[in-house]
Structures are given as C-alpha cells and as structure tokens.
Design a protein with these regions (language model features):
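Glycine/serine-rich phosphate-binding loop and adjoining beta1-alpha1 elements at the start
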Residues: 1-85
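Conserved NAD(P)H cofactor-binding loop of Rossmann-fold oxidoreductase domains
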Residues: 175
Length: 176
C-alpha cells in the first residue's frame, strides 16, 4: 500500500496487531468492516445488514422455486388457487426483506418476532404480526435487539409458532 492511503477490509484490529502496526508505519488509514456500527446512518456500509438483506430476498426466491404451489392468488377459468402462506420468524433486516419479497410475489405473509416494537414495521409491509401475549417488553434487549426470554414466554412462543407453522406453506427463519 502507498503511504497515506486508505484500506477498507475485514481484518480484526485486536487480533491482527502486526497488520495494524504495518499500517501505522505507512500512515495508512484502516477501516475494519466488522467494526462499523449497526445504526441507520451506517447501514449502507454495515456488512451484516447488507448480507442479511440479500439473504431475506434470496430465501423467498428459493422457497418460491421449490414449493409445489404458486405464490400469488390465481383466478382461472378452472377455479381459484389460494396464495401461498409464508411465515417469517424474525423481523430484523433479513426478515423484513423476506416479508417484502413474499408480499411482492403475492403471498399471504405472517411474521413473528420477540420484539413487539417491530409490529408496526411488519404491518407496514402488509404482513400480519403474530405475537405472544405479554405484559412487558420481554424480548427487547439493549439497543432494541432481541434478548433471552423467560421459560414461560418460550413455552407460549412454541405453542403459538407451532400453530402457525402447521398452516404455512413456507417457513423462513431469520432470527439469530
């Protein structure tokens, strides 16, 4: 690298100390992509968010090519074919993209997330938000990310999801 240039990569600054030292000696400015914050402002440069977006989109396309029914509602001379029912578990970046893509293909979409705050985002995409009845913000952790839930919540969650999976043609899991 030329002195005073800029390097953008995935090197780990805390483990690749020799690389950091070599960059410093050449007055090279280094940006490690894994350290970019997961904020709205930095989302275009956030490698995890960009890959999650692609994963959500591709998951729906792969499902559409593999199920034995059509994604949209079809009305033909022979009758009406109901739309595919898609359940998306997890409404983060990948989940929201999966919801949007499935809706654009004409599917009937439901989504689940432990964070009740994403209900508005899910519904704004035209999907039905399914949730475990809870008196508090049980699944919401620091920074709005999901956190560990109680055993009682998990039991109710399993029952709810089991009921919806049994009625779905496609299930896409995006929750980490």
């Amino acid at each position: 690298l030329q002195p005073k240039s800029t390097m953008v990569s995935f090197f780990h600054t805390t483990r690749d100390l020799d690389t950091v030292k070599a960059l410093k000696e050449q007055s090279v400015t280094g940006f490690s992509m894994h350290l970019i914050p997961r904020t709205t402002l930095a989302q275009k440069m956030d490698a995890l968010s960009s890959q999650a977006n692609i994963a959500g989109y591709k998951a729906v396309l792969m499902a559409a090519s593999r199920i034995g029914i059509y994604m949209p509602l079809l009305m033909t001379a022979a009758g009406t074919i109901r739309p595919a029912k898609v359940l998306v578990i997890g409404a983060g970046v990948a989940g929201l993209q999966a919801i949007a893509t499935a809706k654009r293909l004409g599917s009937q979409v439901e989504a689940f997330d432990v964070r009740p705050v994403v209900k508005e985002q899910v519904e704004s995409l035209g999907a039905k938000f399914i949730e475990v009845e809870s008196s508090d913000e049980e699944g919401v952790g620091e920074g709005g990310y999901a956190k560990e839930t109680s055993d009682d919540y998990k039991k109710r969650q399993q029952e709810l999801i089991h009921d919806h999976i049994s009625k779905s043609d496609v299930v896409i899991t995006t929750a980490l």
